[in-house]
């Protein structure tokens, strides 16, 4: 059962519209859909809230910058005594095109610095990941420049569509039906 949903991104207006903030876009949509206003909480190094689906679920958008996301996740997990297997981390994914969304259980960080830090801080990679496709840069554009740039209008629409697909499956996912959600999203 998922008790904490974390949306990854970078804080501040300079990053609001960048691909790397797909996790923030998800968490903000989820909070808004449930009438939840995320508030800054210094002890958790992020914006936090809670929604009630089948059970209360904590929401977190770390304000530590991507590479230090683990600080916020570990602080909240320790405070609420949430084991890694009850955490869902939502993040941008270079390996999938815009509009693609996938669930992954456990695993490595795949070069994603936010995931790398969360794994280091939790001492485990045993959390669920909701991977929102943003695609790869074309030509010789550096990956760092790509993820820190705004997507095209069509890519942003595709990413928004992926977020909506994921939100439509969320109750089922939170109830622990990971395989069924994988079957719905991985088509």
Swiss-Prot record:
Location of this chain's protein in the cell: Cytoplasm
Pfam families, alphabetized: Pept_tRNA_hydro
Catalytic reaction annotation: an N-acyl-L-alpha-aminoacyl-tRNA + H2O = an N-acyl-L-amino acid + a tRNA + H(+)
Active site: 20 (proton acceptor)
Family matches, as Gene3D superfamilies: Peptidyl-tRNA hydrolase
Membership in a protein family: Belongs to the PTH family.
Subunit and partners: Monomer.
Protein name: Peptidyl-tRNA hydrolase
């Amino acid at each position: 059962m998922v008790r904490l949903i974390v949306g990854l991104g970078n804080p501040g207006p300079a990053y609001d519209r960048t691909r790397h903030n797909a996790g923030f876009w998800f968490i903000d949509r989820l909070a808004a859909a449930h009438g939840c206003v995320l508030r800054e909480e210094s002890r958790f190094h992020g914006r936090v809230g809670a929604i009630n689906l089948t059970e209360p679920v904590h929401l977190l958008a770390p304000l530590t910058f991507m590479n230090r996301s683990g600080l916020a996740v570990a602080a909240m997990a320790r405070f609420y005594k949430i084991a890694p297997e009850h955490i869902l981390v939502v993040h941008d994914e270079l390996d999938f095109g815009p509009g693609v969304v996938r669930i992954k259980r456990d695993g490595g960080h795949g070069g994603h610095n936010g995931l790398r830090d969360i794994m280091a801080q939790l001492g485990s990679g045993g959390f669920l990941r909701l991977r929102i496709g943003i695609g790869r840069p074309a030509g010789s554009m550096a990956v760092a420049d790509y993820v820190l740039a705004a997507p095209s209008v069509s890519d942003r629409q595709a990413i928004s569509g992926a977020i909506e697909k994921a939100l439509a499956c969320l109750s089922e996912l939170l109830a622990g039906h990971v395989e069924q959600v994988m079957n719905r999203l991985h088509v």
